[in-house]
A protein has these predicted regions:
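A broad, structure-centric signal for solvent-exposed, well-ordered loop/edge residues
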Residues: 26, 80, 127-129
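Short secondary-structure junctions
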Residues: 64-71
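Acidic, His- and aromatic-enriched active-site or binding-groove loops in soluble protein domains
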Residues: 89-131
Length: 134
């Protein structure tokens, strides 16, 4: 896939990209900020977002899921416009500059590195924590 998806079909195609055994690209762009405020949460450089997302899934999320069971993705990919809006409005988003190569998967950080991060919930642990374990 080259360039930002420009149609529903191309966005569906992006969502069907398999990042690992358990995860697809469509698992990661959900954003309450984007949905509530009508801001598209679509990568401008899907090929970079896919490469970063694959590493996140293969090196971190798959091993966590193999150990603890199903994971819930709370926040992952953010388009720069979504992240900037969230930062400006105090919605728990760091600045875009701090989120390149983090939540903004398709833009490189100041050192030129790509990366991806996700905020996750481990239901197994959440249940134990609720019941008093830590």
């Amino acid at each position: 896939m080259r360039g930002r998806p420009g149609s529903v079909r191309s966005l569906e195609e992006l969502g069907r990209v398999r990042l690992s055994a358990s995860f697809f690209m469509r698992d990661f762009p959900h954003s309450e900020i984007a949905e509530f405020h009508g801001i598209p949460n679509i990568p401008d450089a899907p090929e970079v977002a896919i490469a970063a997302g694959r590493k996140l899934c293969e090196l971190l999320l798959e091993p966590l899921q193999a150990t603890f069971g199903r994971l819930a993705i709370r926040s992952a990919y953010r388009a720069p416009a979504v992240n900037e809006f969230g930062n400006r409005d105090g919605l728990s988003c760091a600045s875009n500059l701090r989120n390149y190569g983090r939540h903004i998967w398709d833009l490189r950080d100041a050192a030129g590195a790509i990366g991806a991060m996700a905020t996750i919930v481990v239901p197994w642990f959440a249940d134990r924590y609720r019941d008093g374990a830590d």
